Amino acid sequence: FPWIPGMDFAGTVEAVGDGAEGFEAGDMVFGCTDGGAYAEYVEADPAQLVVKPMEFSYVDAAAAAYVSQTAWQALYRHGRLGKGQHVLIHGAAGAVGAFAVQFARYTEAEVYATAAGRDRDFVLSLGADVFIDYRTEDFAAVARDMDLVIDLVGGDTLARSYGVVRPGGRLVTLVGKAEEELARECGIEAVSMGVEPNARD
């Protein structure tokens, strides 16, 4: 202590430390750090920064940094999603899920998405091909032989998701513990992940 929370930020570079390259005072940037972002000034590694597009407000840029990077790493670094593959995204109406749906759609994957029925129009507008109301529908009866499942819900949803992944496919959970033995029995790869703040993703 004192400990300052917060990971997402956006602002103008005030000063550049010795040996730091790629940015200069006055640059408009945003990014994600390991903590300390809820402050007037943030110390960040240049590897955690990207230049803010002019069309983004600082508020929008800061709001997107952590959740978009989390979705990206889940889909591509851990999930290795490719064009034409089938992906099921649990919790698609949330912040990370909404980015995941859009990224997957951009990749030209077939996107299955679960959320509450009230969010149907929103999730479909993001690019989901198939919407599943988790309250009234059994996702396991709709989404079968998935190349990838992104779990943002955990609990029973995670436990039942192993059965909808095709042999050789992948399950990525951000909120639960991947069961390696169960994954082996199903012939799939399962991984638990947390976001790694960096500018590469």
Q: What is the meaning of each model-derived region?
A:
Residues 1-201:
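Terminal helix/beta-alpha structural elements that buttress the NAD(P)+-binding lobe
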